[in-house]
Amino acid sequence: MRKNRATKREILPDPVYNSRLVTKAINAIMLEGKKGLAQQIVYQSFDLIKKKTNEDGIEVFKKALENIMPSLELRVRRVAGSNFQVPTVVSKERKQTLGLRWLILSARKRNEKSMIEKLAAEIIDASKGTGAAFKKKEDTHKMAEANKAFAHLRF
């Protein structure tokens, strides 16, 4: 076990939008260290969003992320030999991380041609309150509501 908790590294804002949130999205999309490619995907999907919706790409992205960030999550707790799914409140940092993760995973599963189109379509859907990422959040909240009885088993 480690002696102290690891310190959080500061994430630098991205060069185009000067936003830490966009940097987190780029880092989440990045595979095998190809950051330049990840940046292209994110920026071009923001441009595509602007073309399709006539709204600023980053504003639609922020709205989409706001719609899919969960306020509750389920954590498994073992009590007396039984596993219980305990609903817990999610911190701001984890909300953001889960929202980005769900957005990108559901974008990767879509059927559009390129990742740029997939990401843009998923962001637009999430901003409207539809799409796979939004459904994932709704399912998580329903499960948390169903397991409300175990909330007293907090961590």
Swiss-Prot record:
Indicate yes or no for the key word Cell membrane: no
This entry's Gene Ontology molecular function terms read: rRNA binding; structural constituent of ribosome; tRNA binding
Top-level lineage group = Bacteria
> Looking at the keywords, is Cell wall biogenesis/degradation present?
no
What GO biological process terms does the UniProt entry carry, in alphabetical order? translation
CDD domains associated with the record: uS7_Bacteria
Instruction: Give the record's GO CC terms.
Output: small ribosomal subunit
Keyword annotations for this protein, in alphabetical order, are: Ribonucleoprotein, Ribosomal protein, RNA-binding, rRNA-binding, tRNA-binding
Per the UniProt entry, the signal peptide is: none
Which InterPro entries does the record cross-reference, listed alphabetically?
Answer: Ribosomal_uS7, Ribosomal_uS7_bac/org-type, Ribosomal_uS7_CS, Ribosomal_uS7_dom, Ribosomal_uS7_dom_sf
Give the family per the record. Belongs to the universal ribosomal protein uS7 family.
Q: What does this protein do?
A: One of the primary rRNA binding proteins, it binds directly to 16S rRNA where it nucleates assembly of the head domain of the 30S subunit. Is located at the subunit interface close to the decoding center, probably blocks exit of the E-site tRNA.
The subunit field of the Swiss-Prot or TrEMBL record says: Part of the 30S ribosomal subunit. Contacts proteins S9 and S11.
What is the protein name stated in its UniProt record?
Small ribosomal subunit protein uS7
The species is Malacoplasma penetrans (strain HF-2) (Mycoplasma penetrans)
